[in-house]
């Protein structure tokens, strides 16, 4: 598929009814009661089956703002279950603060073995629904551009599908070698695949041969959700459940999944009479179950206090909300073209029912849920359940790039691996397991001595070995802004979703014909989603009125009276108006006209309101001044402390944060390296069966399997500066041009693999680079060569064609050092500068975050030394790209010394950064 980008979603207004402005506190009672709120709503889409070919960004120094939409779209939808994610974030912060691992304090409060019980509902759709879509304007195909649409003729009625109507891929006219399919998707099938040890013992897709033994049919026995979570957690976590169904929803799938014209492929806005879209399916499913089985044991599925609602640190207690709701929808998924339903299909996702929904006849609610298609393998269940536990996506969900993670992590494309699609998902990476308390890497701090560590394999880690290595870097202040004057400014903070935070003061407004309150503003506020307000109260703070804000030239910079409020957040925040939003691009001198309040004593405050998911830098304000007829009567440069200002925290739901503080323009960030040993063992055998799509059309799907270079050592870089792995907007950020994200792999073979011969001739792209999932196949540091591979391309306008390139094995790389670059940099081609492979690997940090050169090479990879020293703008200079060449390396080194017998691990030499 050519285009898989994120959707913008809005939270239904009903979710905010009854919302309060205070955060909950721990209750004296031990009885937990979780009340899902708007801050718990999210929607996160399963990774696309086929990798998009991203458009190469323009040359460095171009307009970065032109790419901001991809960031806005994605950051709304890359995170996991917010209630659980807040717990994981707190664990990470405590671990970094104390120097311990999350497992050290998790298991002191709960028993080490937890078994989650999943309510699993198989849902098919009413074959007699006759949902009327006459005149509905929809996307033409799942792959269509947003404006490539089709209006349904009068009399268009939608019904079904029922289960067991997906065609057998073996009967298709064109070769399909990767689609998962069984004859009967029965409750027994799902019970075996999810909740047993043996799994599905009958071979699947008997038209294909198993690559392991050459026999007809693919053997997927033993690869179950239960076994996977037990293996990843080293026995600390398991799942159980029993599939219920098939339940028949009252409507067609189209009612829930229809993609409207103007949307993106994942759009599931549904029928115009269904305001919740796909979210209504969870409600309808439990309604049908409650009606048909009035004695259903709902309480059996409420064993956990997922959010620690009562604040007692005990997560192993009921909280009144079903812990884990798993839905399976009949038919194919929209992510694999939707099958017979096409754009009317549902896209696999994890989400929550906004505000929760009470199960009829009970005092229990549903909130968080995951949904997968009928023909899913175990991988997508494992991936979406990871979101249920609070984990984010690690792939570049914007579709504008391919982050260097791919099949190395379940929370990226690892869910899709196996000899047949999704049959043998790969492990979570070390960071995922660490925050969940399932791995405790050996910790090194700046200034520690160089040491040897015996690191065991990630899957079924041997005794007397370490789970991995964590190398902490010094906590660095990140420069956000320079205060307008002096050393301080007021700052709204950026650590709170659904914030309603203010800083205000009393003001005696002087008499005069032109009274103005001036301030210097510097803000980055999520455009049209989050807002700042300057508000005035004349009744002691009982009521507040938003004021228009003007710049020095007298132009209004707040939302005008006719502002359409496209995301309805001004309404959500209390029917407000006159909000500031967007990005000032630096300091700007603004004012509020207070002439109408002349001679009065008023209260004035700056208020910052945010919604869920994406919270940019926020609002800095400095150098306040009150003038009357041009003369200054009061001023405050924020250098004397609060000086009469008072900060007030608040929330629209149940979130909390630091609120407004006096800030020097910096914030502390945490960065560290992680290293783990991966081997073809257990579920990580799936690393042998990554893939690259050759063609996907007319229901048929052909791939080339790609073997990742295990056994080997993965080196991860975790950077809290970033909230996800959307790469394109951060390419030109400090310290050097290249990939930056929240958690990326250092690619030991970062130079791109490229198509050759006829395949290159048919490839319309400039560099002929292979897709990202193939590029990352050789990322691990290893003692041996990488594996040969074959990659095939379907040429444009030549359906089902195959033009292939073969690549031989490359020499293994045994040592990581932050003295050298691991990013391919720029290349000189036809007299111009271009990204060599813009979304590859990651940029390593430098001492004090100092800028260092960006690598520049010729097309053949040789250094383009004649360009060294060239300033290309934005503070970037071309050179070797090696921080060590400029004395700016932190001094981190991770070196392979020797493998353990059977490749069960490796002895690793770790050099921590200098203090």
Where on the chain are the PLM-derived regions?
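Secretory targeting and sorting signals
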Residues: 1-28
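Extended, low-complexity, turn-rich repeat/linker tracts enriched in Gly/Pro/Ser/Thr and Asp/Glu
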Residues: 496, 509-511, 522-530, 612-615, ...
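Active-site-proximal segment of zinc-dependent metalloprotease catalytic domains
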Residues: 31-408, 412-415, 566-571, 585, ...
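Extracellular beta-strand-rich recognition modules
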Residues: 515-523, 601-609, 638
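Short beta-strands within extracellular/lumenal beta-sheet-rich domains
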Residues: 491-510, 585-593
């Amino acid at each position: 598929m050519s285009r898989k980008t994120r959707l913008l979603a809005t939270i239904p207004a009903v979710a905010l009814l009854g919302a309060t402005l205070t955060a909950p506190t721990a209750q004296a009672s031990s009885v937990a009661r979780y009340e899902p709120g708007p801050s718990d709503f999210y929607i996160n889409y399963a990774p696309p089956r086929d990798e998009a070919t991203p458009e190469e960004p323009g040359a460095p120094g171009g307009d970065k703002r032109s790419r901001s939409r991809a960031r806005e779209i994605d950051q709304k939808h890359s995170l996991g279950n917010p209630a659980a994610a807040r717990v994981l974030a707190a664990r990470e912060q405590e671990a970094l603060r104390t120097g311990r691992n999350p497992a050290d304090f998790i298991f002191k409060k709960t028993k080490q073995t937890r078994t989650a019980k999943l309510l699993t509902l198989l849902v098919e759709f009413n074959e007699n629904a006759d949902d009327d879509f006459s005149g509905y304007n929809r996307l033409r195909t799942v792959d269509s551009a947003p404006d490539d649409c089709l209006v349904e003729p009068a009399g268009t009625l939608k019904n079904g599908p029922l289960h067991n109507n997906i065609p057998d891929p073996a009967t298709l006219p064109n070769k399909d070698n990767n689609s998962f399919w069984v004859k009967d998707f029965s409750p027994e099938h799902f019970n075996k695949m999810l909740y047993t040890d043996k799994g599905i013992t009958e071979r699947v897709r008997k038209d294909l041969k198993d690559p392991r033994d050459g026999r007809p049919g693919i053997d997927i026995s033993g690869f179950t959700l239960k076994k996977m979570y037990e293996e990843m957690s080293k026995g600390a976590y398991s799942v159980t459940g029993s599939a219920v169904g098939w339940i028949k929803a009252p409507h067609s799938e189209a009612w829930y999944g229809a993609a409207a014209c103007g949307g993106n492929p994942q759009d599931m806005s549904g029928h115009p009479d269904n305001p919740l879209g796909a979210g209504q399916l969870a409600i309808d499913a439990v309604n049908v179950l409650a009606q048909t089985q009035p004695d259903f044991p709902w309480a059996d599925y409420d064993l956990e206090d997922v959010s620690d609602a009562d604040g007692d640190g005990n997560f192993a207690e009921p909280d009144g909300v079903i812990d884990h709701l798993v839905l399976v929808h009949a038919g194919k998924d929209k992510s694999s073209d939707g099958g017979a339903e096409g754009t009317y299909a549902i896209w696999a996702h994890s989400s929550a029912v906004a505000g929760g929904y009470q199960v009829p006849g009970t005092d229990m609610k549903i909130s968080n849920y995951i949904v997968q298609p009928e023909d899913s393998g175990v991988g997508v269940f494992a991936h979406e359940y990871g979101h249920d536990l609070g984990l984010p996506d690690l792939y570049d969900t914007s579709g504008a790039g391919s982050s260097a993670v791919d099949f190395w992590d379940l929370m990226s494309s690892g869910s899709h691996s196996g000899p047949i699609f999704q049959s043998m998902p790969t492990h979570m990476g070390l960071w995922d397991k660490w925050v969940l308390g399932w791995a405790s890497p050996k910790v090194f701090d700046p200034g520690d001595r160089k040491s040897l560590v015996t690191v065991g394999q990630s899957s079924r880690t041997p005794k007397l070995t370490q789970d991995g290595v964590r190398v902490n870097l010094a906590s660095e202040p990140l420069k956000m802004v320079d205060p307008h004057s002096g050393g301080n400014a007021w700052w709204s903070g950026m650590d709170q979703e659904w914030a309603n935070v203010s800083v205000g003061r009393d003001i005696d407004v002087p008499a005069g014909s032109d009274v103005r309150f001036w301030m210097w503003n510097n803000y980055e506020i999520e455009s049209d989603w989050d807002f700042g307000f300057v508000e005035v109260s004349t009744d002691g703070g009982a009521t507040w009125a938003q004021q228009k804000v003007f710049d020095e030239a007298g132009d209004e910079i707040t939302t005008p009276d006719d502002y359409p409020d496209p995301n309805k957040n001004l309404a959500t925040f209390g029917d407000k108006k006159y909000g500031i939003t967007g990005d000032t691009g630096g300091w700007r001198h603004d004012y509020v006209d207070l002439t109408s309040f002349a001679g009065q004593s008023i209260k004035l405050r700056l208020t910052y309101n945010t919604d869920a998911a994406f919270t940019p830098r926020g609002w800095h304000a400095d150098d306040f001044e009150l003038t009357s007829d041009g003369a200054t009567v009061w001023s405050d440069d924020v250098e004397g402390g609060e000086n009469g200002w008072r900060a007030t925290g608040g929330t629209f739901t149940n979130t909390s944060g630091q609120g407004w503080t006096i800030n020097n323009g910096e914030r502390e960030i945490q960065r560290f390296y992680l290293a783990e040993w991966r081997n073809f063992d257990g579920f990580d055998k799936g690393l042998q069966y990554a893939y690259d799509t050759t063609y996907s059309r007319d229901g048929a799907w052909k791939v080339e399997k790609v073997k990742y270079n295990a056994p080997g050592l993965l080196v991860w870089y975790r950077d809290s500066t970033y909230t996800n792995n959307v790469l394109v907007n951060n390419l030109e950020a400090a310290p050097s041009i290249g990939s930056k994200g929240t958690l990326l792999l250092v690619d030991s073979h970062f130079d791109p693999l490229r198509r050759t011969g006829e395949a290159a001739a048919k490839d319309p792209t400039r560099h002929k680079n292979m897709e990202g999932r193939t590029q990352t196949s050789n990322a691990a540091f290893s003692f041996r060569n990488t594996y040969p591979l074959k990659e095939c391309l379907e040429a444009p306008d030549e359906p089902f064609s195959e033009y292939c390139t073969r690549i031989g094995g490359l020499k293994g790389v045994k040592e990581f050092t932050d003295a050298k670059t691991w990013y391919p940099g720029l290349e000189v081609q036809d007299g111009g500068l271009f990204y060599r492979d813009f979304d590859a690997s990651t940029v390593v940090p430098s001492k004090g975050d100092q800028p260092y050169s960006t690598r520049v090479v010729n097309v053949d990879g040789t250094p383009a030394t004649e360009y060294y020293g060239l300033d290309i703008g934005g503070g970037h200079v071309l050179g070797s790209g090696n921080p060590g060449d400029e004395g700016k390396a932190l001094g981190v080194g991770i070196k392979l010394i020797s493998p353990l017998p059977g490749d069960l691990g490796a002895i690793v030499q770790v050099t921590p950064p200098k203090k």
